[in-house]
């Protein structure tokens, strides 16, 4: 199914990387369900600017009940079920190596918070999408990961561990759901220049990453978002269970 014919849910789709993903999908002609938690102003602006393509829904994706409500509202609005899900939403986190919790300071609550935001949120959206995707014999799920799983140069223990679990879930879901025509993949990036999460990152860190990257620049949110289009397009119809790293070649998959 071409992107222009799809209804795509983007969780956290009104800020940072999520906004870049939403804008890329709008440009491709897709209908986009923009989920947001607190970015109401931007979400409603998007809906006003693209009334035929965008439907904005506030929901906490770590709540199963709210996710189910989100899917029901989107289906009622567009008259058709969601075809694809991009699990992008990030619970509160800043990429600031100096301020990160050290291993001896980690708590069960902090670890669980990141796990819920990464794995449970993806589980809930996948479960909510499943019945309609099975009936259609088509579905696309893209989970957003991190290259820190392969190369933890800064040990963000809670965040990286949660994303590693999400990668495992991506692979097990792909194995389970492929028989129904549902492809599940992950797209992993490094530090992006810039998003809300990377605003605390000092300039010298961006310079260091650029000098260490084969493309000699730090990947932008727009560049990362463009790679998602491949996983949603017919060109990747035989691709599932994969983790594509989009970081300019810093980490070799």
Across the structure, where does each feature detected by a protein language model lie?
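Short, small/polar-rich loop/turn modules that mediate ligand/substrate recognition or access, typified
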Residues: 178, 183, 239-241
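Short C-terminal tail/terminal secondary-structure segment
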Residues: 151, 211, 229, 240-253
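Alpha-helical segment proximal to the catalytic Tyr-Lys
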Residues: 131, 175-176, 237
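A short, exposed helix-loop element centered on a Lys and neighboring polar residues
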Residues: 126-127, 171
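Catalytic loop of short-chain dehydrogenase/reductase
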Residues: 91-95, 102-114, 140-165, 170-179, ...
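Conserved glycine-rich cofactor-binding loop
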Residues: 7, 14-16
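A glycine/serine/threonine-rich, flexible loop-to-helix segment
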Residues: 44, 99, 179, 186-213, ...
């Amino acid at each position: 199914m071409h992107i222009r014919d799809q209804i795509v849910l983007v969780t956290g789709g009104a800020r940072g990387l999520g906004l870049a993903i939403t804008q890329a999908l709008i440009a491709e002609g897709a209908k986009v369900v923009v989920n947001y938690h607190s970015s109401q102003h931007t979400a409603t602006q998007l809906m006003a600017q693209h009334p035929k393509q965008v439907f904005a829904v506030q929901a906490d994706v770590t709540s199963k009940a709210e996710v189910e409500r989100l899917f029901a509202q989107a289906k009622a609005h567009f008259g058709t079920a969601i075809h694809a899900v991009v699990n992008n939403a990030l619970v509160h986190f800043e990429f600031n190596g100096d301020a990160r919790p050290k291993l001896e300071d980690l708590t069960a609550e902090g670890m669980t918070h990141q796990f819920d935001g990464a794995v449970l949120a993806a589980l809930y959206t996948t479960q909510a999408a499943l019945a309609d995707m099975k009936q259609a014999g088509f579905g696309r799920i893209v989970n957003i990961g991190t290259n820190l799983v392969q190369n933890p140069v800064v040990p963000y223990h809670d965040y990286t561990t949660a994303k590693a679990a999400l990668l495992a879930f991506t692979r097990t879901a792909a194995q389970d759901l492929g028989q129904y025509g549902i492809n599940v993949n992950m797209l992993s990036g490094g530090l992006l220049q810039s998003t809300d999460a990377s605003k605390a990152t000092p300039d010298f860190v961006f310079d260091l990453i650029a000098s260490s990257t084969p493309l000699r620049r730090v990947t932008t949110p727009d560049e990362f978002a463009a790679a998602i289009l491949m996983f949603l397009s017919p060109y990747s119809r035989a691709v599932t269970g994969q983790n594509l790293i989009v970081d300019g070649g810093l980490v070799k998959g």
